[in-house]
Amino acid sequence: MPTINQLICKGRSGLTRKKKVPALGKCNPQRRGVCTKVYTTTPRKPNSALRKVARVKISGYGEVTAYIPGEGHNLQEHSVVLIRGGRVKDLPGVRYHIIRGALDLRGVQNRKKARSKYGVKKSG
C-alpha cells in the first residue's frame, strides 16, 4: 500500500486497454496484405453456413484471418488485398474484413443496392 506522499509524487498509472485490431497499428484505417490461404469455415452455434475467409500476411506484423464479404469472389493465393477492422461475430478469431473492389479483389457482380459497401460502380 503506497503512502500519501508516494501517491502525490508518482500517482497511479491508468489501465491500458487491449486493442481490438492490433494489425492496423495506431493510425492506419486500412492495410495491404498478401493472401496465403483462402478457405471456408463454419460459424459458431446456433448458426450454420460456409463462411469465406482468407489468411492475410501483413508486412511488419504477421498473419491475420480476414472475412471476405458478399457473394462470390476471385481471391486466390498471392492475391494482394486491403483489410479494414471489423470482426465477424460468429467466427472466432476473425477480426478483420477484406475491402471489396480494392486491389486484386473484384466487387460483387450484379449488385444493385448497398453498392459502396461491395465495391460496385454505378451502371448506366
Swiss-Prot record:
PROSITE patterns reported in the protein's UniProt record: RIBOSOMAL_S12
Residue numbers carrying 3-methylthioaspartic acid: D90
Keyword annotations: Methylation, Ribonucleoprotein, Ribosomal protein, RNA-binding, rRNA-binding, tRNA-binding
GO terms assigned for molecular function: rRNA binding; structural constituent of ribosome; tRNA binding
Highest rank taxon of the organism: Bacteria
InterPro entries recorded: NA-bd_OB-fold, Ribosomal_uS12, Ribosomal_uS12_bac
Listed SUPFAM superfamilies: Nucleic acid-binding proteins
GO biological process annotation, one example: translation
HAMAP family given in the database record: Ribosomal_uS12_B
Assembly mode: Part of the 30S ribosomal subunit. Contacts proteins S8 and S17. May interact with IF1 in the 30S initiation complex.
PANTHER family referenced in this protein's UniProt entry, alphabetically: 30S RIBOSOMAL PROTEIN S12 FAMILY MEMBER
Function as written in the Swiss-Prot or TrEMBL entry: With S4 and S5 plays an important role in translational accuracy.
Protein name: Small ribosomal subunit protein uS12
Organism: Wolbachia pipientis subsp. Culex pipiens (strain wPip)
Gene behind the chain: rpsL
